[in-house]
């Protein structure tokens, strides 16, 4: 049964795992002395990697996606959006070192990750699905 599978083929698991992955990054950051408060003043202009820019564009689409899903009574739009966002973040995570030696770049990347997590959490909440910090 797909709904019970803990694999990338299960869209709920895949999106929840994206949320949990960001939480894991923040646990690692805390071990390095960085917390969410440090992220608030991060310089987002440090984000120039194509994967980072794609994530930023994707995040900007969330309000419009929610609006269209509500107006058209098509909740699957939110599901598809979240799957794409989670996929983009998983790719970004696998290609880039979020917590590298450049502390200012790490802060900017954590800011991006925090916003991905915030949008995933909000989207899952709209769908009535939990957003776990660990899996």
What kind of feature is each model-predicted range?
Residues 1-135:
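Non-catalytic interaction-recognition regions
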């Amino acid at each position: 049964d797909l709904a019970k599978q803990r694999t990338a083929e299960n869209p709920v698991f895949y999106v929840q795992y994206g949320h949990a992955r960001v939480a894991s990054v923040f646990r690692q950051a805390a071990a390095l002395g960085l917390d969410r408060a440090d992220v608030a003043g991060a310089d987002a202009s440090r984000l120039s990697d194509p994967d980072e820019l794609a994530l930023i564009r994707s995040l900007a689409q969330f309000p419009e996606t929610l609006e269209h899903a509500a107006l058209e009574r098509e909740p699957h739009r939110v599901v598809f959006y979240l799957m794409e966002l989670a996929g983009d973040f998983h790719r970004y995570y696998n290609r880039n070192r979020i917590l590298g030696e450049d502390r200012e770049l790490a802060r900017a990347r954590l800011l991006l990750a925090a916003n991905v997590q915030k949008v995933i959490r909000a989207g899952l909440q709209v769908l009535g699905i939990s957003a776990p910090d660990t899996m």
